[in-house]
Design a protein with these regions (language model features):
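Conserved alpha/beta catalytic core and glycan-binding cleft of carbohydrate-active enzymes
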Residues: 107-113, 281, 294-451, 459-463, ...
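Aromatic- and acidic-residue-enriched carbohydrate-binding clefts of CAZyme catalytic domains
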Residues: 155-162, 193-249, 260-279, 392-413, ...
């Protein structure tokens, strides 16, 4: 162990866990099990051996927390660990983790290889940085894996798979129309085999020590440290702050996904979120796991204006805002994926569920709608495979969900048949419109906008390779899909009636002549919800939303036909000289869905081809001259 060296110590502050600079010294605090012995281990930088071991005394103890203050402590000279009951313990509150610089590398059996580091005292130049403050009703959310997103992108000039590489993607996101990025776990976690006697890393499961890695990172982690192997430089703090600053300069917000398992202390989760918000200026969090208290986070003053996303929570515990546009809480909505995929593939009895999900937008919290995520098929694979193909995960294809609610359009896997390929392309266009024309927050899983595939693997948690990495060659191959998604995002943004701040009621409560939203079908003003029905018409009254210039939005009618035959929709009458004009048709291959030159108008009936979504917009027709009309 360490040589016998003396360092002056004092009783520290137990309220602040971890290693924190204080005056001219450093405060060390660690929580230990009852009746435990503990020491602080200090290492000289880049030294393989401990420099000194300083035992905590009973005088340092408050409850189960040992706290020690070392005056005149030079942070630049040292790294540290704790020793608890004879086992080396890397501080879960460490602001920097040393020894995990290369992703997936085994750390061996040396318990001193992984250790904690300190925050830098240098002031970072934020250059008048400001939170973009994207309200939920204007948010276009884009989720990605930091490493997998750029690892196979040949256009990246820097180190691929890093925060620095993501900076190069900002113009791409701006072109697509994205204004909020969500990062899958980007704090330090133990993706590969660990040293056998490192107590702090005991939660790595056995299967990740057998040649595979936990690529995603949904496990216990070091929640205060940016992941070192996601950095191109030796300065994780500066690199991550620079990434956030450049996002904000581009008007893009950043959401961090954080997973807290059952054994995690809810207070640790709270402190972690507060830290990332205050120190790194992160804009929000997608919180997962059983080790969190949603109520604790929702009622914290520091997080009161922070976007917080959960999969489940007690609605009555939400701290309500004065206006729907100010809401900060959101629910990730897997029900949307399940029901809308079933509607897309023409399952029975899905019309009522589809109508619910498309309109759902509560006043006190938002809903995040998506058709693909990391946990399941990609958008491309959803229309290419009926069954999971997870053999590469080395679990005999038993892992991953058996319920994918997918339809391969007649052939399992890639096909050269034109009819199959065209149907798949149409179904992907349909899926994106389902997400982008729903009232909730649309979420796109990175790469889906140009048909990225995982070859049917619906659980690529361990695939740090071409399966788990985004295939950027598909962007050129599927350029038309990218353009369609880009246009669909722009269409959503242009029409505020498609994303109002709060709930729509289905009544004309402002006496505008039409309800704010209404349901239709083969009969106007009537939705057929019988189990055999596979079509739905939704009309939005544009007078209930205003554009940035104060003008009323246009009324919009969306016809969903997922029958395998043509269907005739009866259109509601419009007042005055207005008629319906077709602006989007997912079956229009030549025009790539968007009908800019369309001149025909509709007033009574609309024929929609099989498995197609059509969007109509109310337009003013020229008034006929009365003298001419009398002839």
């Amino acid at each position: 162990m360490a040589e016998s060296r003396k360092m002056k110590t004092e009783k520290g502050l137990a309220l602040v866990p971890g290693a924190n600079p204080l005056a001219d010294g450093c405060n060390f605090a660690v929580e230990v099990p009852e009746d435990s012995r503990a020491s602080l281990i200090l290492y000289k930088k880049r030294s393989a051996k401990p420099y000194v071991e300083i035992p905590f005394t009973e005088e340092n103890r408050t409850g189960n927390v040992y706290a020690m203050y070392i005056p005149d402590f030079n942070l630049k000279e040292y790294e540290y660990n704790f020793l608890i009951n004879g086992k080396v313990y890397t501080d879960p509150y460490a602001y920097r983790i040393l020894g995990r610089e290369r992703f997936g590398a085994e750390v061996g059996t040396n318990p001193h290889k992984v250790r904690g580091g300190f925050l830098k005292k240098e002031v970072f130049d934020w250059e008048n940085d400001k939170n973009p403050a994207i309200p939920y009703h204007e948010m276009i959310l884009y989720k990605l894996h930091v490493r997998g997103y750029t690892k196979a992108n040949r256009t990246i000039t820097g180190t691929k798979g890093t925060f620095q590489a993501l900076e190069e993607m900002i113009p791409y996101w701006k072109e697509l129309g994205i204004n909020t990025i969500e990062l899958m776990p980007a704090y330090e976690f133990m993706e590969s085999g660990t040293c056998k006697n490192s107590e702090s890393e005991k939660m790595v499961s056995e299967k990740h020590t057998q040649g595979r890695v936990n690529f995603w990172g949904y496990m216990y982690g070091y929640y205060f440290a940016p992941k070192r192997s996601y950095c191109a430089t030796d300065d994780p703090e500066k690199e991550f702050k620079t990434f956030i600053k450049k996002l904000h300069q581009a008007g893009i917000a950043c959401i961090m996904e954080m997973y807290f398992p059952r054994e995690c202390n809810p207070v640790t989760a709270l402190r972690a979120l507060q830290f990332w918000k205050l120190y790194y200026r992160v804009d929000g969090f997608h919180v997962l796991g059983e080790g969190v208290s949603a109520k604790l986070l929702m009622h914290d003053g520091v997080l009161s204006d922070t976007r917080l996303m959960f999969h489940d929570f007690d609605e009555s515990q939400i701290r309500k805002k004065k206006k729907p546009e100010d809401k900060c809480i959101a629910q990730y909505n897997p029900g949307f994926l399940q029901d809308m995929r079933r509607f897309l593939k023409s399952d029975e009895d899905m019309v009522s569920a589809a109508a619910y999900h498309i309109r759902r937008n509560p006043n006190i919290y938002a809903v995040i709608n998506y058709m693909a995520c990391q946990d399941g098929f990609t958008m491309n694979d959803m229309v290419t495979y009926n069954y999971r193909h997870n053999e590469a995960n080395q679990e005999n294809n038993h892992d991953g969900s058996s319920y994918n609610y997918s339809w391969n359009c007649g052939v399992e896997g890639p096909s050269r048949r034109l009819q199959i390929r065209q149907m798949r392309e149409r179904q992907i266009r349909n899926a994106f419109l389902m997400v982008l024309l729903s009232q909730g927050v649309p979420m796109i899983y990175g790469g889906g906008e140009f048909g990225n595939s995982q070859n049917g693997n619906n659980n690529a948690y361990c695939q740090d390779n071409q399966v788990g990495w985004i295939d950027w060659k598909a962007l050129k191959k599927n350029e038309s899909l990218f353009q369609f998604v880009k246009n669909a995002i722009a269409f959503r943004k242009e029409h505020p009636i498609l994303h109002v701040p709060g709930e729509m009621y289905g009544v004309d409560y402002q006496t505008r002549g039409l309800p704010d939203v209404s349901l239709h079908g083969e009969r106007a003003w009537y939705m057929n919800s019988e189990n055999t029905s596979r079509l739905l018409g939704i009309m939005y009254c544009g007078a209930y939303a205003h554009r940035a210039d104060g003008s009323e939005d246009a009324s919009i009618y969306v016809a969903y036909n997922f029958h395998w035959e043509d269907r005739i929709f009866a259109l509601p009458n419009l007042a005055g000289y207005r008629k319906w004009k077709k602006v989007i048709d997912t079956s229009a291959v030549k025009e790539n869905g968007f009908l800019e030159q369309e001149q025909e108008t509709y007033s009574k009936k609309l024929k929609v081809t099989p498995r197609t979504i059509v969007v109509l917009m109310a337009v003013e027709e020229e008034k006929k001259d009365a003298s001419v009309a009398a002839l």
